[in-house]
């Protein structure tokens, strides 16, 4: 097997092992055995488990980051369409790369690999914040709240994606529909004045209760 092919084989084998057993539970021996090679072959290509793990994480980061960035930069798309596209980009990745998503969501190295799931979410939050800031100004809402809402929307989709990975009873389309329904209708119906219940539990606007 040529060097590049062997490298790709080891990356694929390692991705499955890391997704199944985690970083700490996976050894070079495990990876070599799965790939049917000797341990020195793994060390030759990656220098050890840490180097191989870094390559696996970096590949997944780039794949997911590119998909979501392209979705959120779709030209001439309105706010609702961008919510749909961003949501579907994440769910598409989870569906097609479940092993990669498992690795990213429990990545132990943080910034050491040149990127992580957290860095992807931070970039998404920034992009959503910019979009919401313009929308809030147009609707007469306080633009200073845009960062909070960007965090909330991004977290909602991200956490639901992690839940869906382990609870696939709903289809991807159903999950996306529910997420966009909640996100869009919640944002679309934001009021300029909203108050929490008082200490006695009385609602400021009971007519809007469920």
Residue ranges and their predicted role:
Residues 9, 13, 17-51, 55:
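Helix-turn-helix
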Residues 1-5, 76, 143, 191-210:
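N-terminal intrinsically disordered/low-complexity leader segments
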Residues 55, 70-96:
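Hydrophobic alpha-helical connector segments
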Residues 62-66, 85, 113-137, 147-152, ...:
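Amphipathic alpha-helical packing segments from all-alpha helical-bundle domains
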Residues 26, 30, 53-60, 67, ...:
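Alpha-helical DNA-contacting segments of helix-turn-helix folds
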Residues 20-24, 75, 97, 139:
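Short coil/turn segments at alpha/beta junctions that flank glycine-rich nucleotide-binding fingerprints
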Residues 93-115, 129-133, 159-166, 195-196:
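Amphipathic alpha-helical segments used for helix-helix packing
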Residues 6-14, 31, 56-68, 128:
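Generic hydrophobic, amphipathic alpha-helix propensity
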